Amino acid sequence: MKGSDATLLSFQLLDVSYEMRGSTPVIILWGRGADGSRVVVFYGEFRPYFYVLPDGSVGLDQLAAMIRRLSRPSSPILSVERVRRRFIGREVEALKVTTLVPASVREYREAVRRLGGVRDVLEADIPFALRFIIDFNLYPMRWYVAEVREVAVPHGYSVDRAYTLSGDIREDETRIQEDPLKGLRVMAFDIEVYSKMRTPDPKKDPVIMIGLQQAGGEIEILEAEDRSDKKVIAGFVERVKSIDPDVIVGYNQNRFDWPYLVERARVLGVKLAVGRRSVEPQPGLYGHYSVSGRLNVDLLDFAEELHEVKVKTLEEVADYLGVVKIGERVTLEWWQIGEYWDDPSKREILRKYLRDDVRSTMGLAEKFLPFGAELSQVSGLPLDQVMAASVGFRLEWRLIREAAKLGELVPNRVERSEGRYAGAIVLRPKPGVHEDIAVLDFASMYPNIMVKYNVGPDTLVRPGEEYGEEEVYTAPEVGHKFRKSPPGFFKKILERFLSWRRQIRSEMKKHPPDSPEYKLLDERQKAIKLLANASYGYMGWPHARWYCRECAEAVTAWGRSIIRTAIRKAGELGLEVIYGDTDSLFVKNDPEKVERLIRFVEEELGFDIKVDKVYRRVFFTEAKKRYVGLTVDGKIDVVGFEAVRGDWSELAKETQFKVAEIVLKTGSVDEAVDYVRNIIEKLRRGQVDMRKLVIWKTLTRPPSMYEARQPHVTAALLMERAGIKVEPGAKIGYVVTKGSGPLYTRAKPYFMASKEEVDVEYYVDKQVVPAALRILQYFGVTEKRLKGGGRQSTLLDFMRRGK
């Protein structure tokens, strides 16, 4: 303990930032105390630094002197010291350069790079605040005990107490198993903006309503007077301050709500100081908006990883997850907001729509945040950034932390073109319907391959290096070699991940599945699994700091070899293999033979394998990665069929799924045909909801830059002409209208078309029938029969024909 006024503070770390006090950077740790108070801890002794890797052409002392001469009064170079580190597995001597102002690091980096004798400048692109928590081994969402001195809360800060860090800070081991979200204040919000048939402009279009809700509280609506929204935005600022949330959740607020509110507030002269410091939200890492002292979490970032949901609207995602069903809520299109605001008889519907949006947002937060909190703890990225970052970046921040512990210098990110290499083995399936099929899953195959064969950029044998065959592992097919010892960077990290996950799964067995303890541990093991499984793909990712194409090639080669060996053994056991895909095998469910195969894989090959699921019935086409299956618990899996993937309407997707369900559950092809005929009849009678006819496709570049004429581009151009802003990455929804011209000439934005304009026969001929036939054609069903005529058949007929 340092000094008589020092005290111990137990607090949960929520976020980290820094501010400049004069020319001195001060780290800010935002958290909550064990007594529920909101606290801030300052530390002004940490300084930014980077490493210089010499090329050997100049003496290290001479190079250090050259670097010192670059020092500038605005941010002096405080020290240049010689250090020993490792870089891609090799011992190196480097220079650690420390300066004063974080923003000057990039400038010094460029100046140092121009000096003779410099091979590279490393770790100059790591943000200062993240650098601090990496070096001090602090993880967001975890609890810590720190030696602190209490100080007065500085002007402009909205916290209960403030401290300066005066001594050690260590993890509070008594709270490791505590739910990180317990006791946190969560607030959901959504805004409605006035506009009619064009992109809203914050310079002139008002924010007419803001809905917000504190977890467990009532939904509140702040409403403009006519179109005067100054009081609405000012009222929102005051409500955020009074609720004082630790976590603010929204849906797409990083891309729309925050930028709009920030700009609109400036226009109106309102200070949007919604954080715990008197500053407005600022754009931060990975496109998220930083709200000082609060975690601003965009739930759309979580939804982006729900590959089963094609169109990621709030309504669709909330419906899919059972939070708020579409049929139980008000649904409006963005372009209807102005109309419903202007009509007093419709304004209550608009209020209900906003309430439903806020309710859906809070419901999604309850679903998503537990995983996000655990992923934040595992990766080391704050909760508001962790899902905004791609999985590669999430893993990389954990790797950077591990590198710091191991004395490894972090490589720079280098721009590379997308490389290609042979992927996993995929067997051609045995087409037809198969009953009682077990799916065997190789648990974490690729991370385990990396551990077993010590795969990594630091263990890769480079051209010109000589090692005996007994000293290396040689990958089949590709021939890449990896040193058996010492353990590589990735092996050390993955061993920790895999061991950590095994311990958690063992601990889970001590708790009932519906208990809070089990659920917390389950989210934690999922977060660890996500990062561990990302490691192989990461090495082949062009943006990776630890990029290694040979490593990625070797891992997939070993994966193919393991699958082939398992298939050969299955053949020897008389176990029929129906299909194989990446890290799984589909086999006839003969329990005794399946058990013998599992034993062989575990004991002879050294890999974990388990029965992942059993299909009561599964149907394969002749194509790879394309099947539909009915599990023993009644769930339908549809994999690889066009309506699940490409430019298909929701109606086509629904039809295909229902056809699969009928065929697999009832065995009656005729019942499936009748279902399709009924859909066609409803279409022609105008009884299908127009929203189910919308086809969605993403713009990859500005509409005017497309050379080929495509339907979604035509729709985007029509939107632009109507004053609606469209940018690359936007999902364009269109319907096909009547007419005789090419398809692209008949595409129209769905909100600009009437139901009467829709070309029903296009949807019959090019959507519903093809989607259904992708399955039914294998049972002898033709397009003609779907549209009328033909005999009854059953699944049994097809199975007999296949014998």
Curated annotation (Swiss-Prot):
It is an enzyme of class 2 (transferase). Its EC number is 2.7.7.7. GO terms for molecular function: DNA binding; DNA-directed DNA polymerase activity; nucleotide binding. InterPro entries: DNA-dir_DNA_pol_B, DNA-dir_DNA_pol_B_CS, DNA-dir_DNA_pol_B_exonuc, DNA-dir_DNA_pol_B_multi_dom, DNA/RNA_pol_sf, DNA_pol_B_thumb, DNA_pol_palm_dom_sf, DNA_pol_type-B. The keyword Transferase applies. It catalyses: DNA(n) + a 2'-deoxyribonucleoside 5'-triphosphate = DNA(n+1) + diphosphate. Keywords: DNA replication, DNA-binding, DNA-directed DNA polymerase, Nucleotidyltransferase, Transferase. The keyword DNA-binding applies. One of its GO terms (biological process) is DNA-templated DNA replication. PROSITE patterns: DNA_POLYMERASE_B. It comes from the Archaea. Belongs to the DNA polymerase type-B family. This is DNA polymerase 2. It comes from Aeropyrum pernix (strain ATCC 700893 / DSM 11879 / JCM 9820 / NBRC 100138 / K1). The gene is polB.
